[in-house]
A protein has these predicted regions:
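Generic hydrophobic alpha-helical membrane-segment signal
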Residues: 38, 93, 112-116
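Auxiliary, metal-adjacent structural segments of Zn-dependent hydrolase domains
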Residues: 3, 50-101
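Short pre-active-site segment immediately N-terminal to the catalytic Zn-binding motif
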Residues: 100, 107-123
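N-terminal low-structure segments adjacent to metalloprotease catalytic domains
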Residues: 1-64
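A residue-identity detector for tryptophan
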Residues: 38-41, 53, 130, 134, ...
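Post-HEXXH active-site segment of zinc metalloproteases
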Residues: 132-155
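Terminal accessory regions that mediate trafficking to/through membranes and regulate activation
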Residues: 105, 118, 145-148
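Active-site recognition of the HExxH zinc-binding catalytic motif
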Residues: 120-132
């Protein structure tokens, strides 16, 4: 389903085949982990956005999945992922030790699965997941602009 929807979205830019492949891989991972809560509007909305408007950030999330698959110190957290419309990993892709990274709908780099970390995911990182969905291909540009302007103000 993800591949077909992404292929349809990609056809608007003559990228139907690569978009369909990315959507199929992303959708396959999400489906195998029962990621989306199909009986709630948020789950359907998340799926549609992840495979259309936010396909760029969903593509980036595949990097997190690849690193997680190749890392020995990584574990998937079903309790924070299943029917939550997001993938969550202890360990995995990290830009800096001690920092959590959200790429698309994938949260990586948690130090542990304790209550404090769970709250971080549900109260903070989930906001980034939904920002990536709502802003779609604009999100990476807006995020970098926010970081640059914050750094400039901090100087």
């Amino acid at each position: 389903m993800g591949g077909a929807l992404s292929g349809l979205a990609g056809s608007a830019f003559s990228l139907a085949v690569p978009a369909a492949v990315i959507g199929a891989v992303h959708g396959g991972i999400a489906g195998s982990r029962r990621l989306y809560p199909w009986r709630r509007w948020q789950g359907v909305t998340a799926f549609v956005l992840d495979h259309t408007w936010a396909l760029v950030t969903s593509t980036a999330s595949l990097l997190s999945h690849a690193v997680a698959a190749l890392s020995k110190d990584t574990s998937f957290l079903p309790n924070l992922s299943e029917r939550q419309s997001r993938h969550v990993y202890v360990g995995g892709f990290r830009m800096r030790s001690g920092f959590v990274v959200t790429l698309g709908n994938t949260v990586s780099g948690l130090a542990d699965s304790g209550e404090h970390r769970s709250t971080l995911v549900t109260d903070h990182e989930d906001v980034h997941v939904w920002q990536a969905r709502w802003f779609g291909p604009l999100y990476p540009v807006l995020y970098v602009a926010w970081m640059v302007s914050g750094a400039a103000v901090g100087l």
